[in-house]
Amino acid sequence: MNWKVVLAIISCNIVFMSASYTMLIPFLPMYLTHELGVDASHVNLWSGIVFSSTFVVSAIMAPIWGKLADKKGKKLMAIRSSLLLSISYFLGGIVTTPLQLTFMRMFQGFAAGLWPMDLAIMTLYAPPKKLGLCLGVMQGVMTAGGVIGPLLGGTLAEFFGMRMSFFLAAAGLF
């Protein structure tokens, strides 16, 4: 497959992945209070716990998934990660307590590994003289996804509801 096509596909994948991690930023406090019954005096604490839990677990799991990718195959692990991320967002739409939401975000962190898989896959396809460009594009679209996420999440929550935004994100990642 042509490296430019691979870069385009992976870039789209990265934008969705990165946006999914940050999409709940605009409505997380409201989701916690209005949907999950958190008292306003505890919403800041729960927001911090819920949001950070993904990244704590992800930091632990990403190298493990990377090692599995070396054994099982990079494409298989990328598909696995996308599917598990999609499931995690579906679960975000059905949780009923802040603890369940925290576990969902931890599961999301457990599912992490898409970024290292995408990097590894790109190194297989990019010509050596274009690898730096490809990795730079990938980093740029990851940053763009992180910026797009709150805008997308806020818009989805505004027009479709906070719970529905999780289901739509799940569909986008699937």
Question: Where do the language-model regions lie?
Answer:
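Extracellular/periplasmic helix-loop-helix junction of adjacent transmembrane segments
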Residues: 31-58
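Symmetry-related core transmembrane helices of the 12-TM Major Facilitator Superfamily/SLC fold
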Residues: 165-174
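Residue-level signature of mid-helix packing/kink "hotspots" within the transmembrane helices
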Residues: 55-63, 113, 146-147
